[in-house]
Amino acid sequence: LNHIDKAGNGAITFSEGNLKAAVEDNGNARGSIYVNSGKWYWETLIVSGDSVATVGIAEPGFYSGNLFDSSSTAKGYIYINNGQKRSPAGSASSYGSSYANDDIIGVALNMDDGEVKFYKNNTVQNSGTAAFTSLSGDHGIYYQGYGGTATVILNTGHDSSFAGNKTAQNNTDGNGYGDFYYSPPSGFFALNTKNLAEYG
C-alpha cells in the first residue's frame, strides 16, 4: 500500500511494511501499482472492524467521503462487508455474502476483459458473475473504512500467513510466483514486478 497516496476524511495508520492498514472513518487507502491489462489476483485479511470494512479497486486519484459519496472524477468499485457492492455511479446493490473478521477476501482483476470478481474464503461471489464490468484504464488496490476503523492486511503473494495471523498455505500462481493462502484462479497472477514485466 502507498502510505503517501491516501485520501478521505479519516486517518490511516500503516504497519507491517505498509501491508497492514487501519483505515479510520472514511479514510481511503490505495495501492502503489496500477494495471490496465492482464489478469491479477491479491488477498485481503479482515483483521478487525468488519462492520465498517470495504475491499475494492480504484483508478488513480480516486477518493471518497461517506461510503462512496464521492465528487472524484476518478472511479472506484467496492465489495462491502454486508455483501453489497457499490460504485460512485450508483447506489449499493446486492452482490454476495457478508464477510467478517478473520475472513479472506480475494480480488481477481481481469483487465483484459475489463471486469473484477471477489472471493470470500476461496468461494467466488455471485455464482461467478463479475461484480463490475466495462473497466478500462488503470486500476489498483483500494480500501475504505466508514463509520469506524477497519484494519486489513494485504497479501499480493508475499506472505500467506498475513503477518502471523494465519497458518501459511504456500500456494503460488501459474508462474510459480507468490505465497498465497488460496490458489489464485486459473490464468491470474500475483501483482508483482516479475509478472508485470511479462503480462502487464
Range-by-range predicted roles:
Residues L1-G200:
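PRY/SPRY (B30.2) beta-sandwich protein-interaction domains
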